[in-house]
C-alpha cells in the first residue's frame, strides 16, 4: 500500500488514469497499467496506474476529474493506494481468447464494465482482437447488442411505425438522408434519424446538417422535434445511445479492425435504443469503401437481417454502388447546398443522389404500408417532386432551431482552385480515398466551407482545359496544401481513348 | 492540421503521449488514440493523441519529455499537429490476427517498432492477444528471439563456456541461485547471472541479492565483476538486455496472459544477449505456480530445447517441485539470511534448497566438462561443503560493491508475529499464493526486512501451540495488516488425522 496526497488531473485515457511519481513506485509491487484503488475517509476511486517523472511530485497521486461520478475525494487530502481486484470481465475476455462461447451473463458483464470504464485500453484491445480472431455466434451478438442498448438511453414511441435508414461505411458525398428523411416524414412515417459526425469521411450526415441547423439535441428535444415533424436529423452524440459503442470504436480505430460482431452490434444497438421497428441498411460496395465486393456485402446483409429478426426489428439491406462519391459535392457546406438544390429542383439534381434517396425511402414506404410493393420509389419521387419533402425539411430545420435557407445562401470557402484536365479524354476513375484526403486537407469537417465539387463523373468525356473539379477552403494555406495533395493523389483520372500502345509485334 | 504551442509534459503511456485540449479537437478529424506528428522548424515528434480538459490549455499541445531522444522541439514554440502514417507493423499484426505466418522481415519490423516506442498499448495488446490466440511457429519464435536480443545490448565473452540457470515462474523463496552461481563460478565456469526484481513474487533474486550488495551494474561493471570472479548476481534492468521484453510484459500483465511464443522469446533473448552457450531452465510444476502439471512442463521443456538448438545455445530443462516454497524463508532479508546460512553450514540447511541448488549446478558442471555425467551433483556438493562456494560468493559481493556479512548480521523486520497451530495434526498444505500475498502485505519487496519464515513444511507433525510460521515487517501497521490477511487466507494448513467423520450409516 502507498500513502499519497490526492492531486486532481484530467486526461482521457479510456479508463480512469491514476498517476504516481515513478520514484514512489520503485521497489514496490506496483507497476504501470496495474489496477489500483485510491481510498480515503471521504471516498474512493478505481483506476489504472501510470507513472510520471514530473506531472505529479513524489508523494502525490494524480486522480481523474473528467468523470466526477463516483469520485468523492478532495484535492490535497491524504489517500492510500492499493491493488484492486481485476474486473470480472478479464476472465471472460480470456475465455474468448481461448475460442470459447460466452454466456449471456458473461457478455453482459463485459459490456457493463466497458460502460462503467472499468477496462483499460489494453483490456479492451484484447477483447476486440479476440472477437475479431475467434468471432461470436448469433446468440452472443444478440446479447451484446441488447446490452449495449440497455446500458444507455432507451427512447420509446407511441407510434409503432418507427423506421430508420443507415449506411455502413463511408462513401464521400453520402448526403442522401437529407432527402430520404423528409420524404418519409412527409408521408407520415416516424423516422428519428441520429447520425455520426465524420469518423473517416470528410463529412458525416450530422456535419452536413449542422450547416443548416442545430444538431446537438438531447433526448427530450429530439422527441419534441419528431412529435412535431415525424422526423429529425440530429447528431447521435447528443443522446446517450449505446455508450459502449464509442468506447469500443476508440480501440478499433488504431488497429484498423472492425470485427463483424462489433459492427453488427454497433449498428443494431442504436436501432434498439431509438425504438426502431423497421430499418433499411445501405451497404455501399466498391473500391475505397468498407465492403469490397458483392459476395461480402450479401453475407453481411444476411447477418443484419437475422440479427434484426432476433431483436424484433424488420431489416432490409440494399447493396449500393460505392465506387465513386454520391452526387458531385463533398464537404459539409457543399453537400448541404447540393441536398437543398435537389429538394428544391429534383429534376436538375445528380441522378445518383436522387436515385439512392428515393429507392431507400421507397423501401420504407412499402414496408410501412404507404405504398404497394413496387410503388415505393414512385411515391418517394412524387413527394420529392411536389415540394412536400422540401417543406418538411424546412419544418425539421426550424424545429431543430435553425432558419431555412435557399441553396444560394449557403456560404462556401472563399479560397477556390479549379483543377482542369491536362488532355482530351474520358474520366476513367474517381478515387474515394484521394477525394476524402484532399477534402480533409482543405480543412473539412472542421472547416464546414471546405470541400470538393466534381464537375464530371466516371465515363464523362472531357476536353483538355475543362474543369474536372473545384476545391474550396476557408483558408488560403489549407487550399494550397489540398491542391498540392491533389497533384499527388489524383482524385479524378482522365485517360485518352488509346489505353495502351504496343510498338512491337 | 492543428496549430498549437508546445508544452512539455511527462507521462509514461507506453508510446509517446501527445496531449491536446478537447476543445481543440472538437469538429476535427483528430481523435484520441490517433497517431500524430508534431512538427516545427526545430524538429518533430511522433506520438499518440490524448485529450484533456485541463492538463493543457486551448491552443497548447503537451509533448513528452521522458524520452528526449529524437525530440528537438522547444517549449512554447509554435508547432503544427497532423495525422502520421501508421507504423508498418500494424499490417503485420493484422496478418497475425488473420492467422497467417509472419516473415522474418515482418517480425523484425514489429520488434523494432516496439523498441522505438512507435506502437501504442492498444496496438501492443492486439499483437500479444493475436499471438496468444493464433500462436507462432518455431521460425517465427527464433526470429523474434534474435531480434529482441539484437535491439538491446549484446555482451560477448572471450571464454566459450558461458552458462546460465533460469527459473520460469515464481516459487516463493526461490533463492537457490545464491548457492548455485558461486558453486559454478568456483569451478571456473563463467556464469553472468542477471535476474529480475519481484514481478508477482514477494522477492526476485535481484531483490534478495540487494540485501547483501549492489545489484544495479551497467554492462562494463558486469563484465569487470565476471572477469574477476567468473560470476555475478545482478539486476537485469541495469543492463539494456532485450528491451522489447519489458514493453511486452507491461501489456501482458493487465490481461493475465503470457503467450508461449513470448515466454520462450523473453527468456531466450536474454540468453542470446548475454552470450550464454549453455543454459539450464528450471520449470517449477505445481499448485500456485505458472505450470500446473508435468505434461505441460515437458511440452514447454521441448520447445525451449528446440529453440535453444536453433540459437546455438545448449539447453537442458528440469521440472522441479513447485508446490510449496523453496526452503523456509520468504522475503528479501530472510532469504538472503537463509542462503548465507546454507553457504556457511550446508549440512544444517533445508534439504529442498540444497538439493535444488546442487542439482541445477551439477547439470552445468557436467555440461561444462568439470564433472563426468552423473557426478555433477556430487562435485557441486563438495564445492559447497568445502566452503569454496561461500568464499566465491563473498568475492562476488565485494566486486559488486558490498561488504560480506555473517548470516546473523542480516537485519530482519523488528515487528514480529508468531502464528501457532490451533490443533494437534499434520501440515497438509502450504499455499504459495497465500504466502506471496501475506509477505507482500507485510511490505515486501520494498521493505526488504519483511517476510515469512516457515517453521514446518508439508507432512510435518505439529502439536497445538507449536509455531507454524513467523511474519516479519519493518512497520507495525503492515505487520497487523499481514497478520489479518493470514487469518483469512491460511498460508499453512493443519489437519488432524481424522479427515472426515461419518455419523450416519
UniProtKB/Swiss-Prot annotation, chains A, B:
Gene3D superfamilies: 1.20.970.50, 2.40.40.20, Nucleoside phosphorylase/phosphoribosyltransferase catalytic domain, Pyrimidine nucleoside phosphorylase-like, C-terminal domain. SMART domains: PYNP_C. It holds the Pfam family Glycos_transf_3. PROSITE patterns: THYMID_PHOSPHORYLASE (PS00647). It catalyses: AMP + phosphate = alpha-D-ribose 1,5-bisphosphate + adenine; CMP + phosphate = cytosine + alpha-D-ribose 1,5-bisphosphate; UMP + phosphate = alpha-D-ribose 1,5-bisphosphate + uracil. One of its GO terms (cellular component) is cytosol. Belongs to the thymidine/pyrimidine-nucleoside phosphorylase family. Type 2 subfamily. Catalyzes the conversion of AMP and phosphate to adenine and ribose 1,5-bisphosphate (R15P). Exhibits phosphorylase activity toward CMP and UMP in addition to AMP. Functions in an archaeal AMP degradation pathway, together with R15P isomerase and RubisCO. This is AMP phosphorylase. The lineage of its organism: Archaea, Methanobacteriati, Methanobacteriota, Methanomada group, Methanococci.
Amino acid at each position: 500500500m502507498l500513502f499519497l496526497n490526492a492531486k486532481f488531473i484530467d486526461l482521457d485515457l479510456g479508463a480512469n488514469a491514476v498517476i504516481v511519481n515513478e520514484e514512489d513506485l520503485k521497489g514496490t509491487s506496483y507497476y504501470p497499467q496495474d489496477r489500483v484503488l485510491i481510498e480515503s475517509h471521504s471516498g474512493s476511486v478505481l483506476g489504472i496506474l501510470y507513472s510520471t517523472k514530473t506531472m505529479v511530485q513524489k508523494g502525490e497521486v494524480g486522480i481523474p476529474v473528467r468523470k466526477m461520478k463516483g469520485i468523492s475525494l478532495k484535492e490535497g487530502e491524504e489517500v492510500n493506494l492499493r491493488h484492486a481486484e481485476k474486473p470480472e470481465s478479464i476472465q471472460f475476455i480470456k475465455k474468448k481468447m481461448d475460442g470459447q462461447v460466452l454466456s449471456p451473463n458473461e457478455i453482459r458483464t463485459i459490456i457493463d464494465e466497458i460502460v462503467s470504464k472499468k477496462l483499460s485500453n489494453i483490456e479492451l484491445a484484447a477483447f476486440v482482437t479476440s472477437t475479431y480472431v475467434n468471432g461470436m455466434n448469433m446468440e452472443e451478438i444478440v446479447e451484446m447488442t441488447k446490452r449495449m442498448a440497455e446500458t444507455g438511453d432507451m427512447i420509446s414511441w407511441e407510434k409503432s411505425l418507427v423506421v430508420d435508414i443507415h449506411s455502413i461505411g463511408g462513401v464521400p458525398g453520402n448526403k442522401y438522408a437529407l432527402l430520404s428523411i423528409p420524404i418519409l416524414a412527409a408521408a407520415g412515417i416516424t423516422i428519428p434519424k441520429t447520425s455520426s459526425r465524420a469518423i473517416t469521411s470528410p463529412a458525416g450526415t450530422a456535419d452536413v446538417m449542422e450547416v443548416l441547423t442545430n444538431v446537438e439535441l438531447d433526448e427530450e428535444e429530439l422527441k419534441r422535434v419528431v412529435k412535431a415533424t415525424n422526423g429529425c436529423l440530429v447528431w447521435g452524440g447528443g443522446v446517450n445511445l449505446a455508450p459502449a459503442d464509442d468506447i469500443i470504436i476508440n480501440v478499433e480505430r488504431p488497429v484498423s479492425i472492425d470485427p463483424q460482431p462489433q459492427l453488427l452490434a454497433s449498428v443494431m444497438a442504436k436501432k434498439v435504443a431509438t425504438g426502431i421497428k423497421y430499418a433499411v441498411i445501405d451497404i455501399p460496395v466498391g473500391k475505397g469503401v468498407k465492403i469490397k465486393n458483392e459476395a461480402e456485402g450479401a453475407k453481411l446483409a444476411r447477418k443484419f437481417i437475422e440479427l434484426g429478426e432476433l431483436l424484433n426489428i424488420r431489416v432490409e439491406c440494399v447493396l449500393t454502388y460505392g465506387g465513386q462519391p454520391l452526387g458531385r459535392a463533398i464537404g459539409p457546406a457543399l453537400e448541404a447546398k447540393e441536398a437543398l438544390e435537389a429538394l428544391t429542383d429534383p429534376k436538375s439534381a445528380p441522378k445518383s443522389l436522387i436515385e439512392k434517396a428515393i429507392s431507400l425511402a421507397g423501401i420504407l414506404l412499402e414496408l410501412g404500408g404507404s405504398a404497394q410493393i413496387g410503388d415505393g420509389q414512385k411515391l418517394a419521387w412524387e413527394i420529392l417532386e411536389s415540394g412536400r419533402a422540401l417543406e418538411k425539411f424546412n419544418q425539421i430545420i426550424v424545429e431543430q432551431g435553425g432558419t431555412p435557407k435557399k441553396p444560394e445562401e449557403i456560404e462556401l470557402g472563399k479560397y477556390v482552385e479549379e483543377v482542369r484536365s491536362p488532355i482530351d479524354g474520358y474520366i476513367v476513375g474517381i478515387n474515394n480515398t484521394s477525394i476524402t484526403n484532399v477534402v480533409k486537407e482543405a480543412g473539412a469537417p472542421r472547416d464546414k466551407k471546405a470541400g470538393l465539387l466534381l464537375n464530371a463523373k466516371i465515363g464523362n468525356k472531357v476536353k483538355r482545359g475543362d474543369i474536372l473539379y473545384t476545391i474550396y477552403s476557408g483558408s488560403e494555406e489549407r487550399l494550397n496544401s489540398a491542391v498540392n495533395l491533389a497533384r499527388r493523389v489524383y482524385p479524378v483520372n482522365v485517360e485518352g481513348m488509346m489505353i495502351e500502345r504496343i510498338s512491337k509485334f
